[in-house]
Amino acid sequence: MTWFGPRLDPDHADLAAMLDSLTTKDIVLEDDSTSIRRLVTELAALGVWTLGTTETSGGGGADDTMTCVALERIARAWPALAWASVQVHAAIDVLAAAGAGAGLVEDLHQGRRAVAVVEADAAHVNLAWDGDVLRGSVSRVDAAHERPHLLVLAGTGTALLIRPDDLDVQPVSRTGLAGALTRSVTVAADRRSVVLVDGVDTSAARARLLRGAAAGAAGIAGAAADGARRYASERRQFGGPLTEIPMVRQTLLDQSNGAASAIAVAWAASSEPSSHAAARRACDDAVDVAASAVQSHGGYGYLTEYAAERHLRDAISLRAAVAIPSSSIRAGAALVGTRPATHPLARTP
């Protein structure tokens, strides 16, 4: 598998090689909870499921660049798992910093439980206090689990953790991202069962989500570009491989440029505003590269026997799952140093 990003140091290269040996097993995920759980458990056993969380919380303590490499490699084969891992990272950051949910944090590290992380004021989130009961709905969560916990980032410094028992979940159809086990969620949670996590760095959690989304999108773009180049090298037309045609080579170069752009912005992101920009750019790059890769396969690009059409569907669904437009308001406020007002959900009855 091609690495389209900056030169890797030996530790990063070893991690990429290890994950390549795992992801090249040609395991195509479906919405089968047993196979998903098996892969998550394997990633957890390898220490990469929560690689970027702090050692004090039980994680791998890897820096952002090492985590970026891991997520990009995982997303080449299983982007739904990469996105689920990103949400687990963000949730552990929040919960461990506040000393909340110690048992849940341990289970998240081991892949035994899952969590969906959403923004309280996102367009697909509709939650409000009704007396002592938190009610409402989230139209989409993608946690690679049938019954995840729900962590709601509510304004600055506050998050709410909701148990699976207080959630009614229903399957949701989507374009791609197989293995995400996408669900809609109806919430009816008594105040006493909602864990209010206060005094935490929710801006850092948002940056973690967006930065991880960018790395996942870069993985999709890289896989699509590699697939198109491989097909063009093997497919013979007019007496030789397609790569002998200058226009084909230029198209492949454009795809590689898009993959390189995606990983470059993911690699460089740090703050909430820069991570928002990275996620937006990388998700768009992934869709563009994957769409071009389908065209590079000709009519075969639309057949499920080839991965090209799956990469395009995955890119589209990841961009929808990340909800880039909803994060732009807070990223803009963070950019200019504006402190948002206390979110209504943070004002518990």
Place the predicted regions along the sequence by residue.
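Amphipathic, small/basic residue-rich leader segments at the start of a protein or domain
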Residues: 1-84, 335-349
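Glycine-rich phosphate/cofactor-binding loops in nucleotide/flavin-utilizing enzymes
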Residues: 2-5, 297-349
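Short glycine/serine- and small hydrophobic-enriched flexible loop segments
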Residues: 69-76, 93-99, 223-227, 267, ...
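N-terminal glycine-rich flavin-associated loop
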Residues: 82-100
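FAD-binding core of flavoproteins
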Residues: 105-226, 340-349
